[in-house]
Amino acid sequence: MSTRRRLDAELVRRGLAPSRTQAQQDISAGRVLVGGSLALKPTRLVDAGEPIVVQGPGPRFVSRAGAKLDAALERFDVAVAGVRVLDAGASTGGFSDCLLQRGVAEIIAVDVGYGQLHERVGGDPRVRVVDRTNVRDLDPAVAGDPVDLVTADLSFISLRLVLDALFGVLRPGGALVALVKPQFEAGRQVVARGRGIVTDPEVWRTVLDEVMSACEERGATIMGAMASPITGTDGNVEFLLHARRGDATDQPGPDGAAPDHRGLVDAAVAEALGLVTGPQAP
């Protein structure tokens, strides 16, 4: 039996809207068709396989990743206008596109691939492309002076394995906003059980805890975490993490203990469950 969800929640789950607020606005404006018919209520229940079309202007960003970062910058209140950024795992440029639209001064777009960056992003004079570069082996000299912000959207590698490189190009007090993908963080056996899809909330919880702990072990402070409003292209739940690189003025917690991030983990997992299951019908 298929799961039925509210239309606004289903639009977000499918990546057709970056947030439920935007989904509700699209529905109210008469831009959403369900099964070829105009949908008028965001509370309408729809099946997971039901055809849905959003009419109107094209996507805001060159890839779905842009909407993920946009939601994180809003939630975490990270101001990027005028800053220098290193975008790790730039790919087609979804994160970079979001940053450019928000007024960054410079982006160093790093990716292990070649020629993937969308021409709209790669053609912007504020973007310096660094292709064929494994982020794990990133030379800090690539950035010149340390950057103010590092963003990361990486696949087929654990974020924990590249944290040294990412923090190595970030100035003290600078921010890291990274996409956490459980399918690339959990063990192979765990991922294989779900045929590449990680659905167990306890695995999400473990993954977030391990990534946050790895950041803290490198002197960073965890500032926030959230469930991505859009799943990965394969349907996997993803998370966004905000950390700040420590500096000489940072002080340890009581008795030298690291800050307790369990509350952030619990909140992010609960948010992800809400996105996956949707609100309960009355």
PLM regions: where:
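A short glycine-rich, Lys/Arg-flanked "PGG" loop and its adjoining helix->strand segment in the class I
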Residues: R160-V177
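Residues at the N-terminus of the alpha-helix immediately C-terminal to the conserved SAM/SAH-binding loop
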Residues: S91-S96, G113
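Short, glycine-/aromatic-enriched active-site segment of Class I SAM-dependent methyltransferases
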Residues: P182-T199
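Conserved class I S-adenosyl-L-methionine
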Residues: A81-S91, L99
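Conserved S-adenosyl-L-methionine
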Residues: C98-E106
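S-adenosyl-L-methionine
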Residues: A105-L161
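Flexible, glycine-/basic-rich loop-and-beta segments that form/coincide
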Residues: V237, H242-P282
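A basic, amphipathic helix-loop patch mediating RNA/tRNA/ribosome contacts
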Residues: M1-E50
